[in-house]
Amino acid sequence: MSGRSVPHAHPATAEYEFANPSRLGEQRFGEGLLPEEILTPTLYHGYYVRPRAAPAGEGSRAGASELRLSEGKFQAFLDVSHFTPDEVTVRTVDNLLEVSARHPQRLDRHGFVSREFCRTYVLPADVDPWRVRAALSHDGILNLEAPRGGRHLDTEVNEVYISLLPAPPDPEEEEEAAIVEP
């Protein structure tokens, strides 16, 4: 009995299979369950219960995100099919690439829904944020791409001078000086 162990990995360990995913899926928030999701047995991964099979048909990739890093370029793919092109915003702030989208409440097959999300990617040190390009495919997949420079971009360090302020006068010394002066 002592030689047996239950296979289990804590999410904070390197052995945990979802510790550093390159793909994020199952982000269909607020869309309801399909019949095959209810009746399908689940897999238990310690802390996360998920359907055994991904639902088939349209919408199975809704919200999916994939990140690819190669020697030549940085690439991220993000499913934004629930949004129109004018509802999606892409911007860079320093070495961060931010994708956000928002649409007001509207009617869908389950009732009324409003959606909003913001995903931020950290760009590798050798990617120039000014060279990021975005393209949206006909099926709602946003392709974010930037060439990797092969060299780390210099970071600007601004060293701020610290000036020393004079100490405030001591109240006792002021009283003594006032007594001596008359």
Curated annotation (Swiss-Prot):
Example of a GO MF term: unfolded protein binding
Pfam families according to UniProt: Crystallin (PF00525), HSP20 (PF00011)
Keyword Cytoplasm (UniProt): yes
UniProt note on tissues of expression: Expressed preferentially in skeletal muscle and heart but not in the lens.
Domain of life: Eukaryota
Location(s), subcellular: Cytoplasm; Nucleus
GO BP annotation list: negative regulation of apoptotic process; protein refolding; response to heat; response to unfolded protein; somatic muscle development
Predominant subcellular localization, coarse grouping: cytoplasm
Domain sHSP: 55-163
Entry similarity comment: Belongs to the small heat shock protein (HSP20) family.
PANTHER family linked to this entry: HEAT SHOCK PROTEIN BETA-2, HEAT SHOCK PROTEIN HSP-12.2-RELATED
Functional note: May regulate the kinase DMPK.
Protein name (database record): Heat shock protein beta-2
Lineage: Eukaryota, Metazoa, Chordata, Craniata, Vertebrata
